[in-house]
Amino acid sequence: MELLFTPHPLIEAPTDEEILLLGESDPKALEELYRAREGLIKASQDDPLRHGFDLAGWDRIRQGLMEYNEVLALGGNRSGKTTGCAKLVMEAVTKNQDGHIVCFSQNADTSVKVQQASIWEMMPKEFKKKTKSIEGYINFSMQNGFTGSSFIFPDTRTRVDFKTYTQFSNNQTILEGFEFGFKNNPDLNIGSWLDEYLGDAALVNTLRFRLATRNSKMLLGFTPIDGFTPFVAEYQRDARTLATKPAELLGGVEVPVVQYAPARDAS
């Protein structure tokens, strides 16, 4: 039986020469290697929250959330910002009790198709069916996202709400009375996630008050294709570089990958 190793960017497959040599010397070991590797790939696809692979930038975001109240993740299109943020949010949801997280997207369409879809991708597979109980409710469709733009994770009784920047612009009182984050102040205490934030400081400043009582953190994502907005530029003002990395496409020039923003006390 011919063994076809699935291509994967992170799990290296044996070369044709190695396959031939091992197949001749120890066919059973080759088959075990094949099954183990294919099993890792399938597990990462079926349950990326618990068995998936982290990009280096995600670990930097996670570390920033441990040290600062706000983390701004910058990156180009298809750099994995949204997926990484969704994984961190779901880590907080599944590990910590009785929390409340609010997630913002540009509009209803991007909320369903991008932000809610990325959260659903990270949902543990045993909850990827309609779940309804006293302590939890999950109902999702690709067409409409989460029913009521919200879900409650049963095992932790943590609620996640999805809202849009348009909603806040039309009514800046929609967050009145809420506290976001987790009361027990865990290590990964995320209270809000703002994806592709293009607005001014109004929403961020409002959320700061809603996060303060639970000492929870704010996660923001932004794609600087056409430069920085005035609000994002505030983070960049007098920023101190904490870590650099050689840029392959720039001839190995060292570029910042982690910075500290004193203007916002953020990473």
Predicted features along the sequence, with ranges:
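Phosphate/NTP-binding elements of NTP-utilizing enzymes
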Residues: 2-267
